[in-house]
A protein has these predicted regions:
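Active-site Tyr-X1-5-Lys
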Residues: 14-17, 38, 56-93, 112-124
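C-terminal substrate-binding subdomain of Rossmann-fold SDR/epimerase-dehydratase oxidoreductases
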Residues: 119-247
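Short beta-loop-alpha junction of Rossmann-like oxidoreductase domains
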Residues: 38-40, 98-101, 218
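Short clusters of hydrophobic/aromatic residues that line enzyme substrate/ligand-binding pockets
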Residues: 4, 43-45, 96, 102, ...
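Glycine-rich "substrate-gating" loop/helix at the edge of Rossmann-like oxidoreductase active sites
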Residues: 2, 57-61, 93-108, 132-145, ...
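Conserved active-site region of classical short-chain dehydrogenase/reductase
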Residues: 9-17, 70, 111, 144-151
């Protein structure tokens, strides 16, 4: 945990400071929904930052991301007028799509499910057993939508971007706008892959947080909305996974 925190702090600090030193006027810092307190109300609003204790298992990563947000805000305050510095931060929800990590031991939920259901389909396995009750709710955003949102935020006039926050709370959430249960997600993945066997859940295994849903109303109010629904996004993600198998 110590090395992880150190490396994340150093990477972003070097990038942000080097950007300033080399005359980079605009920069975007990508955070994570884990910056918000463990017990924050749902959906997660930008104003909830630093209002409570963090989730212990994610604390080093969250602290690094919070530091990056505050570093961007502080550089804006110190160097905004003198050097035209305009460093912005966005907080994405759970992302998925082409280019994801499908490793069986350290992938996130969607690529993990894609791999498992694909292997079950190929082997004609009659059942796929998923850890947990399937009841926790999560929000997912297709990677192309995240890229589009990032460009949208970077292209905003500075006065418009600044008017939707304050100098020390300038980050913007980027989410899909609705969430699904893990059980619903599993069935969506199975449909995208064409797996027709049984899907079961092992409720003796831990579930994690019951819900994690971003409030993206600030970004929506600026005029941006996601374009790729979950079903279409999963089909695209699966085709990308098949491509990795042929490499």
């Amino acid at each position: 945990r110590g090395e992880f925190l150190y490396e994340n702090l150093m990477i972003q600090s070097n990038v942000i400071h080097s950007a300033y030193k080399n005359g980079v006027k605009k920069l975007m810092f990508l955070g994570s929904s884990c910056i918000y307190p463990k017990l924050a109300p749902q959906p997660l609003k930008e104003e909830y930052l630093l209002t409570g204790l963090l989730e212990p298992t994610n604390e080093p990563y969250a602290i690094a991301k919070i530091a990056g947000i505050k570093m961007c805000e502080s550089y804006n305050r110190q160097y905004g007028q003198s050097h035209d510095v305009d460093y912005r931060s966005v907080m994405p929800t759970n992302l998925y799509g082409p280019g994801d990590n499908y490793h069986p031991e350290n992938s996130h939920v969607i690529p993990a499910l894609i791999r498992r259901f694909h292997e079950a389909k190929v082997s004609s396995a009659p059942e796929v057993l998923i850890w947990g009750s399937g009841m926790p709710m999560r929000e997912f955003l297709f990677v192309d939508d995240m890229a589009a949102a990032s460009v949208f935020v970077m292209d905003l006039e500075k006065k418009i971007y600044d008017s939707h926050g304050n100098p020390m709370e300038s980050h913007i959430n980027v989410g899909f706008g609705s969430d699904v249960t893990i059980a619903e997600l599993a069935h969506e993945v199975a449909n995208a892959i064409g797996y027709q066997g049984k899907i079961s859940f092992d409720s003796t295994k831990p579930d994690g947080a019951p819900r994690k849903w971003m409030d993206s109303s600030k970004l929506n109010g600026l005029g941006w909305a996601p374009q790729v629904g979950l079903s279409l996004g999963l089909q695209s993600a699966y085709q990308a996974y098949l491509t990795t198998l042929s490499l």
